[in-house]
Every structure is written in C-alpha cells, then in structure tokens.
C-alpha cells in the first residue's frame, strides 16, 4: 500500500491527528483515472454530509462529499473529460468556524493565491429517464440506481453524473 499509494502515510497521519479533535474522520479510497491507480484520501467529518437518520454510509440514500479543488486541478479534469467543460467560479464563502478552529490548532493558514472551487460530490440513488432499472418483463421497475453526481456549490451547475455500480451486476450494488 505505502509503496504504490505515496499519499497513504501522510493522509493517514493527518487523519489520526484530526481524530481526537473532531471525533470522527473518514478515508475515501477510489480509483483515480489520472494517476491510473487506487488513491486513499483523508476526509474530515465536516466535509461529509450524511442524512441524520442514516445508520451507516453503505445504506444511506445519499452521502455528499464537499470537495475543495483548485481551479487548475478542475481545469485538468475538465480537459480530460472527467467533468463537463463549463465555467465554474471560485467559491466566495468564508471558512466555517470548525475549519478556522482546526486550522488554528494545526498551525495551518489558508492560501489566498490559488482560489479554490467547492464541489459537491453526491452519492445518490436516482431513477434517470433512459437509464431505468428494467425488470424481467422488460418494463422499468421504478427502482432507483446508485450514481455519483457532482455539482458546483457556488452556482449549482452540473459537472458530472457517473454510474456507481458495475454494469454486469444485476443487483446494481453501490461500488
């Protein structure tokens, strides 16, 4: 893990540092198309939005990851076709009290040179027209399927909709 995932140890160390301060932390492991390998990232609890009634992330109807991304990184992903090539402006919102307190405790200060864009990566179940779940009788079942929908927090523009299940899986389980 640490030989291939160069970010694993620093991300894990950062997660362990934040754990006593926040009470909860998360790891996001996913395949990165640009690096062409699995990646493991630390996600602070304040960057994960989960319904109050959810008992776990696996069965939650929606989970939203608040992603801070630089204009340059977003542009790279747009040029590569990962996100739609549309204009998205940097977020104008001030950091939350939680973020300011965590930054102060950890000795980090925000960099105002590179404007960050806030994206909302929503892991949701949807019944999309033209992509419905089809039953044995060939008719749509009305069952919602798992997707990852990414939008800009600043203006609500849609950047991507990606299937979050294997096309070979008849049960359409979340990846």
Where do the protein language model's features map onto the residues?
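Extended alpha-helical, oligomerization-prone segments that build pores/tubes and scaffolds
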Residues: 1-175
């Amino acid at each position: 893990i640490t030989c291939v995932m160069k970010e694993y140890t620093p991300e894990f160390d950062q997660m362990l540092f934040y754990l006593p301060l926040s009470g909860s932390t998360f790891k996001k492991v996913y395949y990165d198309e640009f690096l062409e390998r699995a990646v493991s990232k630390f996600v602070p609890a304040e960057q994960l939005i989960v319904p109050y009634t959810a008992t776990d992330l696996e069965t939650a109807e929606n989970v939203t990851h608040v992603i801070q991304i630089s204009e340059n990184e977003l542009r790279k992903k747009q040029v590569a076709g990962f996100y739609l090539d549309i204009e998205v402006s940097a977020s104008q919102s001030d950091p939350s009290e939680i973020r300011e307190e965590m930054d102060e405790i950890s000795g980090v200060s925000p960099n105002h040179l590179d404007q960050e864009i806030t994206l909302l990566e929503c892991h949701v179940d949807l019944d999309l027209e033209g992509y419905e779940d089809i039953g044995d009788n060939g008719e749509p079942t009305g069952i919602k399927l798992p997707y990852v929908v990414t939008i800009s927090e600043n203006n609500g523009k849609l950047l991507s909709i990606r299937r979050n299940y294997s096309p070979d899986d008849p049960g359409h389980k979340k990846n």
